[in-house]
A protein has these predicted regions:
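Generic N-terminal targeting/processing segments that precede catalytic cores or assembly contacts
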Residues: 2-123, 130-134, 144-145, 150-169, ...
Length: 322
């Protein structure tokens, strides 16, 4: 998310919804994979992923979940899909020819994903960064520099000429959040909006020769001109006396404003997250088995050992862990 926008509770605070061990790896890579899938119009026939030897992913992409998340994203899965640990198997079953290349690329960011995908005789390239906490930034599409965060519906148009006429036509309509001209040979017009450009709209534009559409991957979209009731606790107490209503009501009002959502939509998303948390706790307490785990499961014995006084006395921390 750009620093100029106010944070979203679901995008930046309660989340990301993910399978461990690392949000910078597994959560971000699902989102990058989903955008790459959209870019090529569906599940790719082949995919090459490149990691820089000078970055952090060359030695951790498998153990920290980058591969798992990326494969799931290329299949169009959500981050909470139970099949995630087997995403590689499903990708192979889908007939995707997958390759990972480690090379010295001198990427300026340590968490850089370079993807080259092929589908229907066409090649697509995407470069994206994992910026922490599951957040991402797409910095290049098919060789053209962009700045995208997965919080808008994006339509990418390849156009003849300098793109000025196409961009001007779109800006004159006024119902798109951002229109940017980038790249050369061909020039690309990148449209960020609350919806994709329809086929009829594209046909009415001058000199468009190719179209790609990508849906947002963040839980809460951004939009032009959004405002929120407060940005920090000091501003919050100026809007109303916090002793007169639960703090949750302030959070609810904030996220409704940030996302352009109604109360029911925000509460439904929170209930979904709560259900995932509860299911994860129950699964953890029941214990899981993985062949590559160094230590066996521990959580299923935690309560009994705590009652027997056999744990290091962590006080309330032990209760919190349980």
């Amino acid at each position: 998310m750009p620093a100029t926008l106010p944070p979203s509770i679901f995008n930046d605070v309660v989340g990301p919804v993910m399978r461990g061990p690392s949000s910078s790896h597994s959560a971000a890579s699902v989102r990058i994979g989903r955008l790459a899938r959209d870019l090529c119009g569906g599940t790719p026939e082949s995919a090459l992923v490149e990691f820089d030897t000078e970055g952090s992913l060359a030695t951790t992409h498998e153990s920290q979940g980058s591969d798992m998340g990326l494969f799931a994203g290329l299949l169009g899965w959500e981050a909470d899909d139970e099949r995630l640990p087997r995403s590689g198997e499903f990708l192979r079953a889908a007939g995707v020819a997958m390759a990972i290349r480690i090379a010295t690329l001198h990427d300026p960011h340590p968490n850089t994903y370079r993807l080259t995908l092929r589908r229907g005789g066409k090649e697509h390239r995407l470069v994206a960064l994992s910026t922490g906490g599951g957040m991402i930034e797409v910095v290049a599409i098919d060789g053209a520099a962009v700045t995208l965060y997965g919080d808008y519906t994006v339509t990418v148009l390849d156009v003849d000429g300098d793109g000025a006429a196409t961009a001007a036509t779109l800006r004159d309509r006024g119902d798109f959040d951002d229109v940017v001209v980038t790249g050369s040979s061909p020039v690309r017009v990148v449209v960020c909006a609350q919806r994709p450009l329809g086929d009829a709209e594209v046909a009415a534009l001058p000199a468009v020769r190719r179209v790609r559409r990508m849906e947002p991957v963040l839980p809460v979209r951004s939009r032009r001109g959004l405002t929120v009731p407060f940005l920090h606790a000091g501003e919050m107490v100026q809007t109303a006396d916090p002793t007169t209503r639960p703090l949750s009501e302030f959070a609810l009002a904030y996220e409704c404003a940030r996302g352009g959502l109604d109360r029911d939509a925000v509460l439904a998303q929170m209930r979904k997250i709560l259900a995932i948390v509860r299911a994860g706790v129950q699964q953890g307490l029941a214990g899981t088995e993985y062949r590559d785990r160094i230590l066996p499961r521990q959580s299923h014995r935690f309560a009994a050992l705590m009652e027997q006084g056999k744990l290091i006395d962590g006080g309330v921390l032990n209760r919190a862990i349980l």
